[in-house]
From Swiss-Prot:
Pathway: Cofactor biosynthesis; iron-sulfur cluster biosynthesis. This is Cysteine desulfurase. It is found in: Cytoplasm. It catalyses: (sulfur carrier)-H + L-cysteine = (sulfur carrier)-SH + L-alanine; L-selenocysteine + AH2 = hydrogenselenide + L-alanine + A + H(+). It comes from Yersinia pseudotuberculosis serotype O:1b (strain IP 31758).
Length: 406
């Protein structure tokens, strides 16, 4: 059965607008994806017809909202094949999820002299929290280097591990290069050495099925807004045995069992001990609708459609003589490039005048820019609503810029 691209595009209202007098070509979904009408309607319905504060409310609206929120927790667990809904923590996004692990697991279990491993392709969100932790605790950060093709050589991992190594933090798919890391094999090697493994799935969950139990990782993190859901909501998956040992990171309402001015505070069980304060309930509802949307389409079908589109895009872009492509041939989601010696910002500005939205800059991956010895790159990202016509518009725009600027 062919992928229903016309129906899919009709589901996303913003795709029908014009930018600078041109039909919009949106190629920036890796930064944040557009929202289907079903997600917009779900949030609107909650605010209009069912809004109430969750937890501890005796009245019907509160009970209904709490039940719906917890149903989404179960839905997320099913979506990534977690063993239990109690392994799912609602956070603001990938960045907060990684910071939670660094500040709760890291500060509780790591000591001076320990070491952790990150890779050269990580987003700043999977670098800076570990650097802050290392500075405070005296922990060493070891960097898994890239190959010339922008990939990780799994045989290089063993050389980074010794009896001080406690944790590996690695992205599943690079937000710049689209490199798809062999996470299952990486996790197996790390676990054999006794490491805890955090996987950044922010660029993966929208492009392929994810099974955290099959991957074997201890933590898995992603954001809703890249999965066609609302902004301000994300997920931290953690194995139950680890979560129950971890102390809270933030204090406040909803994460306690008891509070006494003389006896101190006792904390709720995981996952609720990590969800201080009023949650983004509408965002949680919208995330549930987004998961429903991609599940109905089928992640395997989405993956197959996007891979076909990626192969077409790479073939077309490779015909532009002055264009430099970065990263491996086999990739998912994103295409990083530069056009001659022109600054990425200039290229992006010209494309915007043609109604084409891409991302330009260092993409929160300055170490990766240093690896390629460039200050910035252009990045076009492909999503389930993009088409060959979108790719053709991008190629034509780049050829026009090439002709104008030389």
């Amino acid at each position: 059965m062919s992928f229903p691209i016309e129906r899919v595009r009709a589901d996303f209202p913003l795709l029908s607008r014009q930018v600078n007098g041109q039909p919009l070509v949106y190629l920036d979904s890796a930064a944040s994806a557009q929202k289907p009408q079903a997600v917009i309607d779900k949030e609107l319905h909650f605010y209009r017809d069912g809004y109430a504060a969750v937890h501890r409310g005796i009245h019907s609206l509160s009970a209904e909202a709490t039940q719906q929120m917890e149903a989404v927790r179960t839905q997320v667990a099913d979506f990534i094949h977690a063993a239990s809904a109690e392994e799912i923590i609602f956070v603001r996004g990938t960045t907060e999820a990684i910071n939670l692990v660094a500040n709760s697991y890291g500060r509780h279990f790591l000591v001076t002299g320990d070491s952790i491993i990150i890779t050269e392709m990580e987003h700043h969100a999977n670098i800076v929290p570990w650097q802050m932790l290392a500075q405070d605790l005296g922990v060493e950060i070891r960097v898994w280097p890239l190959t010339a093709t922008g990939e990780l050589e799994i045989t290089d991992l063993a050389a980074l591990i010794d009896d001080t190594t406690r944790l590996l933090a690695v992205t599943q798919i690079s937000n710049v290069l689209g490199t798809v890391n062999p996470i299952k094999d990486i996790v197996a090697q790390a676990k054999a050495a006794g490491l805890v493994v955090l996987v950044d799935g922010a660029q993966a969950v929208m492009h392929q099925p994810v099974d955290v139990q099959a991957l074997g990782c201890d933590f898995y993190v992603f954001s809703g807004h890249k999965l066609y859901g609302p902004s301000g909501i994300g997920i931290l998956y953690g194995k139950s045995a680890l979560l129950q040992q971890m102390p809270p990171w933030e204090g406040g309402g909803a994460m306690i069992k008891t509070v006494s001015l003389t006896q101190g505070t006792t904390f709720a069980d995981a996952p609720w001990r990590f969800e201080a304060g009023s949650p983004n309930t509408a965002g949680i509802m919208g995330l549930g609708a987004a998961i429903d949307y991609v599940t109905e389409l089928g992640l395997l079908q989405i993956q197959q459609y996007e891979q076909s589109l990626m192969h077409y895009a790479l073939a077309q872009l490779s015909q532009i003589k002055s264009l430099t492509l970065y990263g491996p041939t086999e990739r998912a989601g994103v295409i990083a490039f530069n056009l001659g010696l022109h600054h990425a910002y200039d290229v992006g500005s010209f494309l915007d005048q043609y109604g084409i939205a891409i991302r330009t800059g260092h993409h929160c991956a300055m170490p990766l820019m240093a690896f390629y010895q460039v200050p910035s790159m252009c990045r076009a990202s492909l999503a389930l609503y993009n088409t060959r016509e979108d790719v053709d518009r991008l190629v034509a725009g780049l050829q026009r810029i090439e002709k104008l600027l030389g």
